[in-house]
Design a protein with these regions (language model features):
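Aromatic/hydrophobic pocket-lining residues that form the small-molecule binding cavity
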Residues: 13, 17, 44, 67, ...
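Phosphate/pyrophosphate-binding betaalpha-module
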Residues: 63
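Single conserved hydrophobic/aromatic residue that forms the stacking wall/gate
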Residues: 1-7, 11-12
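Alpha-helix-loop-beta-strand connector modules within alpha/beta enzyme cores
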Residues: 13-33, 70-84, 131
Length: 216
């Protein structure tokens, strides 16, 4: 489960995490925290220290995307994997993140990093630096479908028995260009989605939805 943790009062954020931690106690659930680069370095560090006991899979975008040194500082001071990259759109930008040891997990967005081809280049570069890749997934059902195919093809970063496989970020908020755009929408069942195996991305666009939302 990914939690968006953005707020001005540290005590409120702490209480929120305590409630979530209590609700998920003894359950087979992994938590990720996304702060959408809401904080400066010092506040992100304080929050990160408070989050360490929750054994997070990752701490996403703790500072603004441009603050590469800030990412690196947090990564060196926290015992939580640092994730980022959804707002980085070029291979050269990701190269800078990797060279500065700024992130543990790269999150290119297939819809804005050059599509499937661009994502493949970023994935190969990330793995050459030993960086895990877990794409950011947002937007339309077409972006979802492309992301699912890419995620399914990503090899484990470290070839070992206990290597982690990437997971699909699956937003369930109301969005007509996700549910209504496909003739057969994706269905989440027990935390899993079947990977389409038809031609192309494996999906069929609902043309009635296109007509409904088109503008002249």
């Amino acid at each position: 489960i990914q939690v968006g943790l953005v707020g001005s009062e540290m005590c409120i954020r702490d209480r929120c995490m305590e409630s979530i931690g209590h609700a998920l106690k003894n359950k087979n659930v992994t938590l990720m925290i996304d702060t959408n680069h809401a904080y400066g370095r010092s506040e992100a560090l304080t929050l990160g220290k408070n989050l360490q006991s929750y054994k997070l899979r990752w701490y996403e975008e703790p500072v603004v995307p441009e603050d590469i040194k800030g990412y690196a500082e947090l990564r060196s001071k926290l015992d939580i994997p640092i994730a980022g990259g959804e707002n980085e759109h070029t291979l050269f930008g990701f190269k800078s993140l990797f060279e500065n040891n700024a992130i543990d997990i790269a999150q290119p967005d297939i819809g804005s990093c050059g599509g499937i081809t661009g994502a493949k280049h970023i994935i190969n570069l990330a793995h050459s630096f030993g960086v895990e890749v877990n794409p950011h997934v947002w937007g339309s059902a077409i972006a979802q479908a492309a992301s699912i195919q890419v995620i399914a093809s990503i090899p484990a970063t470290h070839f070992s028995i206990f290597a982690r496989e990437p997971i699909l970020e699956y937003d369930q908020s109301s969005h007509p260009f996700r549910r209504e755009l496909l003739s057969k929408p994706f269905e989440l069942v027990n935390g899993m989605i079947n990977i389409p195996d038809n031609k192309g991305l494996g999906i069929e666009v609902n043309l009635e939805t296109i007509k409904k939302f088109k503008t002249n």
